[in-house]
Amino acid sequence: MGKRSAAGLLTSVDSIFTTQEERDNAKRSYVTDLSAAEISDFPNHPFKVRMDQSMVELADSVKQYGVLVPSLVRPMPDGSYQMVSGHRRKRAAELAGLPTVPCIIRELTDDEAIIVMVDSNLQREQILPSEKAFAYKMKLEAMKRQGMRTDLTSAPVGPKLRSNKELSEQSPDSVTQIKRYIRLTNLIPELLDMVDNSVLKEAGKLQMALRPAVELSYLSEAE
């Protein structure tokens, strides 16, 4: 079999076992090492990078073994890169004194980046109520924008209902619970910190802290 025939066969086999979307993503993604100075944080990133015991342990691991899982970044028009997933790994690498961080570079739209950022961080073992609140809000808004762009003939309520249901299906929380979390984004920072701190002290107090906080979210700041 000639080289051209073999290449054609491989292309055909690849087409059978992968989708067009997967092939397109593969073409626009690659891995390289980047310095921390080249990577900006995701704007309004809802997940806190805390200097806690978990971070100390992660930094020690990175110092000993390196960064085992690459971060995900997207290229920006000015030639820099924006972190999508891997803020804690980047910070751990800095604490460990590493000059660069392995990164997957992928072309993503603003809404695609938001959805990937939220989905990747929801896998954490410990997530604060405030983090979930703003993460769910950001992802829901991104999903609604995508729905409006892809289904312009639908009534306005259509994409909204579908987005709420889809978000719940992609998350560990119900539609009702997600709505409760999003209500927390209306709280003043001091009250939101109180909710977070109560959960940090005792994880089992989530529902106990969430109920009054949601009720307070309906009050105006003056009230």
Regions inferred by a protein language model and the residue ranges of each:
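Structural motif corresponding to the C-terminal cap of alpha-helices
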Residues: 66, 71, 143-147, 189
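Short, charged/polar connector segments at secondary-structure boundaries
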Residues: 1-106, 112-125
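Amphipathic, charge-rich alpha-helical segments that serve as recognition/docking helices
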Residues: 91-186, 206, 211-218
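Short Lys/Arg-enriched helix C-cap and helix-to-coil transition segments
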Residues: 189-211
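Short, intrinsically disordered, charge-balanced linker/junction segments flanking boundaries
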Residues: 221-223
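Short coil/loop linkers at secondary-structure junctions
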Residues: 68, 99, 174, 199-201
